[in-house]
Amino acid sequence: CRCSPSFILSQGDGMQLIRDLLDTAFSDVGVFDAVCVTFELAFGATAISSVLGIFLGLLLERARFAGKKIVIRVNRTLMGVPPVVIGLGVYMLLMRRGPLGRLNMLFTVQGMILAQVLIITPIICGMTYTSLISKAPAIRTFAKTMGADSVQTERLVIRELKKELYFAVVTGFGRSISEVGAVMLVGGNIKGHTRTMTTTISLLKSQGIFAEGLTLGVLLLIMAFIIQSLADFFQK
């Protein structure tokens, strides 16, 4: 029985075995925990950024106001800002004497997620906006000729642009899972708590353990490929 104590125990033993094998293979730098933190961070930041980015992209495309071009340029600038700059800004906000110091989010996964949301959201917003301005007007014109109301029209726009929106989300996920500078600044690269696969690779490099760093990089690439393949499958 899958719910029996023996099955649960065997599952726990299996996870512990995987943990021990990974830590032994990679000089006990906490690779198993780093894998868990990496995907908790990547999925959490991507989920939040997707909701914010797509909503802001839709809002920016529909809104008409003075200074809209400036807002678009600012967003495009943020799309290319070095993550370490964002990380430094978040660090200053979350440090004990900072404006958000009372939240105690510095050197936590939650603080790292905040930093990555600020990095990823402009990317998803910009890609969403670009897709909308090129295709949304024609879709809305068609919807109006069919007698659709405003809500039905926007639903049709999102449905017709789902591939473009999916690509924007996947791009954000890729940026998240590969990020080093911001998460190292905000998270502190603490073993078992805020150390990710990319910061582990950086640590191994600084220690001169290049073979293990390269192996871990290949492992990260394989995991990202598997997740991408699963996402493509379910997207269809």
Q: Language model features by range: what are they?
A:
Residues 126-140, 144-147, 151-156, 214-236:
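C-terminal transmembrane helix and the adjacent membrane-cytosol boundary/short C-terminal tail
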Residues 17-30, 184-233:
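Interhelical loop and adjacent transmembrane-helix boundary motif
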Residues 7-46, 59-63, 68, 157, ...:
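Periplasmic/extracellular loop-to-transmembrane helix junction in inner-membrane transport proteins
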